[in-house]
Design a protein with these regions (language model features):
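Short, conserved DNA-binding cores of transcription-related domains
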Residues: 1-34
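RNase H-like nuclease fold core
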Residues: 15, 29, 65, 69-152, ...
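Acidic/histidine-rich catalytic cores and adjacent linkers
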Residues: 20, 27-28, 32-35, 42, ...
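Core catalytic machinery and nucleic-acid-binding channels of phosphodiester-processing enzymes
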Residues: 22, 67-72, 161-166, 284
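Residue-level signal for the short linker/turn that defines the boundary of a DNA-recognition helix
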Residues: 53-54
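Short alpha-helical "recognition helix" segments of helix-turn-helix
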Residues: 58-63
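Conserved beta-strand -> loop -> alpha-helix junction used to position metal-binding or nucleic-acid-contacting
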Residues: 145-191
Length: 292
């Protein structure tokens, strides 16, 4: 029985998106039916542009084509993420900005290390986070815990779901009020207590905060009077720092109350994603917002 051309040959790699074959008799190499040439080059150029951080000018020189041709290939490439939503997940969420009025809110499963959802936003709002959680639940994924940065009103927005305040963000808030090197003895002591936040438990931490408040109670109540007779608290920033800790205390140790759920105590799992995104954007400074 005679063999067809493909039966008497074997695959011999690819060339510009086309399958190559080698004849077993005469050793001649030939190409099969042409594949999707545009899609092949669009994917290749996109990978160089995003993963290898090559600029459009560098791509023009590498592929010996004009600027509009490279842009055409980039615009034609369609990124279609496929997300396999788990039956349940802890969600770490935060928003990072690339410039004023342009940011991305990311919802990530830190235990499986996958991004469940991302939304392009102008501003960080409660509605964005509520919408994101609703969308994840709508996909059949039960949210068993949330880790966030403690934006005002966020804790009460998800009844029935344990919410963990990012301890790193809490430390940043205190540093913003007290500075990295506080001068007042009360500030020095409070900052030292806050530094133990990630290595202690709620009972011990609360005890130290209460003792600090008792010790510096009169100091915190000191007033300064203006020439008009109006008064204000002398140590406003110190008062703001302790108020922040007191308000967030119920959510700083949520992860210890649900040990079986493996809830992180920070949103640090998003930092690698945010840093990578910003590095890619930085490599292409000056690009249009639509391409950004």
């Amino acid at each position: 029985m005679s063999q067809t051309p493909l039966e008497s040959s074997k695959k011999n790699g690819f060339f510009r998106g086309m399958q190559r074959y080698r004849c077993l008799d005469c050793k001649h190499v030939f190409n099969n039916k042409r594949r999707d040439f545009t899609s092949y080059w669009a994917a290749k150029i996109w990978k160089d542009y995003i993963d290898h951080k090559q600029t459009i000018q560098e791509l023009c020189e590498r592929y010996s084509v004009s600027h509009p041709v490279i842009e055409k290939y980039l615009d034609s490439y369609q990124v279609t993420p496929v997300i396999d939503y788990p039956s349940s997940a802890i969600v770490v969420m935060d928003t990072t900005y690339f410039r004023r009025g342009f940011g991305v809110s990311i919802f990530r499963d830190p235990n499986r290390k996958i991004n469940l959802l991302w939304l392009y936003v102008k501003h960080e709002t409660l509605d964005t986070y509520k919408y994101g959680i609703e969308q994840i639940i709508a996909k059949g994924c039960s949210v068993t815990g949330i880790v966030c940065d403690g934006k005002k009103g966020l804790f009460s927005s998800f009844p029935g779901i344990p919410v963990q305040m990012c301890q790193f963000h809490q430390k940043q808030i205190i540093t913003r009020y007290l500075t990295k090197n506080p001068i007042l003895p009360a500030g020095v002591e409070l900052k030292a207590i806050v530094e133990t936040l990630s290595s202690t438990c709620e009972v011990v931490f609360s005890m130290f905060i209460e003792l600090w408040q008792l010790k510096w109670d009169q100091f915190l109540k000191e007033r300064t009077y203006s020439s008009t007779g109006k008064w204000f608290y002398t140590h406003k920033r110190l008062r703001s720092a302790i108020r922040s800790l007191s308000s967030n205390m119920p959510y700083l140790f949520t992860y210890q109350k649900y040990p079986n759920r493996i809830i992180p105590n920070t949103t640090n799992s998003l930092e690698g994603i945010n840093s990578s995104l910003k590095a890619k954007i930085k490599a292409h400074q000056g690009i249009r917002d639509t391409r950004r």
